[in-house]
């Protein structure tokens, strides 16, 4: 799981630090330290992945000129030398240095986007300079961010202290009349704001990436978790600790010792109450697997046996419910771990959903039509869509939801709604997860707002309590986790207040951070902004307004009047008619989509639609692609839908794409529209959550806009789903249904007007808890039938376990009765499996790919070839490092097709990657023209060197993978224990070898055929694991030295002890085998000599 580490320090001259030295170290660069007239060189330091030096938008001209035309490290060098020169005091504070852990769950590109977002909103927005670097250490990606402590003035730097400005815009004065000052940057309050801002942005980007994770930056104490916080050990402390371990001594560091004490205390607390681990996990994730439990335990538990014991104890905890059993991914054959949640989490969300439904059915908080009309007159520029949304939230229900994209007019709508509520006598307040969002709600909509955490704290202290005259607006509701959302819904229920949730459709994904908002919005319905403008016909826009207001019957009447509703007697006939019309209307220049509510309908419609295109020759049979739901065939021209977020490809759940190139388990598709149109390359081994996209579920279509839509109505639809399905189109919509089934249920209008779809129940389980668990699973995108089956299987397993307990109890009772002489217990003998003499190594510190990746960097041939490549870069480009980064070498390594395209681009347009060395034209000097000539001559050579490097890298990778897999297979072999008879023979053989009586040794070994076979099997295992003659050398006389260290590499302490004990036995075995080989060779040689003597010689 991601680590919540965010620390700050001040780079102070008084503590012997220099901001230029710090910058050079972080940028892994060579810099001139002008104050001391010396050069600092950290170019040998590794781990730098990305670097940026960024100025605020209103930065003065002098600082822009200072860093102009410099590299990132060059800009950093120039700026911080300027700071060093400006600060005159011997104890001057030069900069603030932030160290921030990045989440492993996000890719490097996603982490860079996260940091840029944070820097823009919380550093540059305050006028600070941001100098940051991304260090990609294995398992510990992090950034170092240095910021200024003084504002930038027109000529240089401003004062570190600034006057405190009051609400009237004037400086605040003390009682004596003096102006009150505060630090411009670097104070504790400033740090707290930055820390809160970081965790808010972090959780936002985790949610956008589809990561089921929420990071809480508060201390364990404030979170209510009974654990001691561990201490962050810096680079120096960790280096000392490693060196001490290499020498076999304990590191004498106070921080290390204190950290170990806290880890031991936490281990004790977890042993006493393993449920603490569940508290930790469920604060970050609502659905988890065994790996999540292991990640938490690894922080505190080192002993393997204790670790395994606690793993079992936690997973079998009565509070844990298994939602999905361990399965195999059909498309890849990979193991998918079992998924779990806690009963408390499921009950919490179920209670929240019930309370939200209850609030939606309670009336009495509405605004009169008169007040609404007065508001609309004052805001004449409100769109019909915004008016419909205002009517929705100002309705009588005590809960409402609004979904709209950023910039869609939500704030304008909320401002007008606030005025309407205030006219009706209500008090309107607001809240948001982030302080920035709360501030925006207050400034732009005029709604008194705080952060959600601030509201919770004030209510806890009995201040600013809600009442039946309060309207509470929650902005960015999609980012609020289930537990916090449940608390606010419960508060609204108890206080008699009304709560309005405002969110973004991009946050309506089945992830923890947005699951609460989605769960509520799905149940109570919502108004959607940026919907009505989709439709081009006026009557369609009016119908969409009716749908938004819940007047489904009026909307259906409009579509029926314009011959857009087709009813057939049976549903199957309606499907046939839909496909026929779709085939007739299909136009590759238009976007067309079929919508249905049920997944089985979607699958059927996709198959039928594609068959029509194949018949017409518009797409071919296609190439096989193993998707997560089974095999599909894709060809150029196919329409597809992506079913899972993937940040590295820029894909969103429900996004529509069109295939342009198809091959087995690989496609190239276009996504987006207009200027946003782009191509993505999808490899099955990396991403397989896609399907044909001619038809998709209504839920997947949320937020989508297409030209034409065909809707298959089913009895499972309700008012909210109908609203979504019938507002996705621009040009045309056609609805199809089976008249017979709908007539049995009151007709089309009645079914499609229902406030809530009928809940799914299972014939084999009617308990309330199971229904809640299924709803919980469905909200998070888990397959409901799979979850249901898992719960039933687990119920059966529980019954069988109880039976086993009863059987065990009966046996114990029988044993007790036998002890009293009541009956005689039959005697049984069990055979215990013999432990191996030396156990094989079954677990490894890293995966094969990790080990291969590490070794690639040390391969001599690759290093030499890369030196050639880097030298060519220096010949060709004016700034080789920047050009190298622009080439996107990671993509070049990952995909051969991408590599081919990049290298072709390099050869054809080298200037598109970076400025070439030298210059041309009449103003260029002779050396500059010569440098340009050399650069152009070296472009083809650079391409050849890169191609050679890629070929060599692929060859070396395959060799290293084979070597590592062979090594792992070899060291995993168990050396079997010898039977008592074999041990006796072994001792006799050993004595004979010591007496140098090898014939006697062989005689002892051959004395018993079964024993000889056992010893041969033992020798075979030793040979396969350690090598044929490894233990025959003089270096193998004793289990010590380099040979012993080599053979025991990767072993646990107990395995090393086993090896020491087995060493003389294995050495004796190899000596015996060696002597047998010698005797056999001599025998063969003698037989050959005799044969040669007996061969007759023919005389001529």
Curated annotation (Swiss-Prot):
Q: Which UniProt keywords apply?
A: ATP-binding, Conjugation, Nucleotide-binding, Plasmid
* Residues noted as binding ATP in the record, renumbered to the chain: 404-411
- Keyword Nucleotide-binding tagged: yes
One GO molecular-function entry? ATP binding
InterPro entries attached here?
(+)RNA_virus_helicase_core_dom, Bep_BID, Coronavir_polyprotein_1ab, MobA_MobL, P-loop_NTPase, TraA_Ti
> Is ATP-binding among the key words of this record?
yes
Q: Which family does it belong to?
A: Belongs to the MobA/MobL family.
What's the name of the protein? Conjugal transfer protein TraA
Gene coding for it: traA
